[in-house]
Swiss-Prot record:
Catalytic center residues: 37 (proton acceptor), 78 (charge relay system), 129 (charge relay system)
Entry-linked InterPro entries: 6-PTP_synth/QueD (IPR007115), 6-PTP_synth/QueD_sf (IPR038418)
GO aspect biological process, one term: queuosine biosynthetic process
Cofactor(s) required, per the database record: Zn(2+)
Annotated NCBIfam families: 6PTHBS (TIGR00039), queuosine_QueD (TIGR03367)
Gene3D superfamilies, A to Z: 6-pyruvoyl tetrahydropterin synthase/QueD
MF-aspect GO terms: 6-carboxytetrahydropterin synthase activity; metal ion binding
This protein's encoding gene: queD
Positions that bind Zn(2+): 27, 41, 43
Annotated source species: Bacillus subtilis (strain 168)
Name assigned to this protein: 6-carboxy-5,6,7,8-tetrahydropterin synthase
Catalytic activity: 7,8-dihydroneopterin 3'-triphosphate + H2O = 6-carboxy-5,6,7,8-tetrahydropterin + triphosphate + acetaldehyde + 2 H(+)
Pathway listed: Purine metabolism; 7-cyano-7-deazaguanine biosynthesis
Sequence similarity: Belongs to the PTPS family. QueD subfamily.
Length: 146
């Protein structure tokens, strides 16, 4: 994978890790206002997850990279996003737009991180839908662990 430069999230933590991955998935936005995006189409998404924290686990990890890949790539790669429960409601915060995909990945990753004793936090999720279009989701400061 080609090295990427991402917008950086400011945070007070000592450690920061980033996990890159690609997800090939289809979706559609069931709204007339979405234009061509209302038809089923696909992307090879580039996803970057930024996790930060002050404490390492017993293995010396902030979080195991392979777990992050399983949480995201394992769930969404080669699927129709609209078929996932995460994107099945007919409201603007459940439609599989790049914005909602980024927030949903954050929610799923943070839910896992909350189970870890060392309490790392997801500070940013970057989702690139096309070479020229991407979204960054960062939780509001009150949402960070700490």
């Amino acid at each position: 994978m080609l090295s990427q430069i991402y917008p950086q999230a400011q945070h007070p933590y000592s450690f920061e890790l980033n996990k890159d991955m690609h997800i090939s998935a289809a979706h559609f936005i069931p709204r007339e206002s979405a234009g061509a995006c209302s038809r089923v189409h696909g992307h090879t998404y580039t996803v970057n997850i930024t996790v930060a924290g002050d404490e390492l686990d017993d293995s010396g990890f902030l979080v195991n990279f392979s777990v992050l890949k399983k949480l995201v790539h394992g769930n969404y790669d080669h699927t129709l996003l609209n078929d996932h429960e995460d994107f099945s409601q007919d409201d603007r915060y459940s439609l599989p737009t790049t914005e909602v995909v980024a927030k949903t990945i954050y929610d799923n990753v943070q839910a896992y991180l909350d189970t870890l004793e060392n309490k790392p936090t997801c500070v940013q999720v970057f989702v690139r839908e096309t070479p020229t279009s991407y979204c960054v989701y960062r939780p509001k400061k009150g949402g960070l662990n700490g």
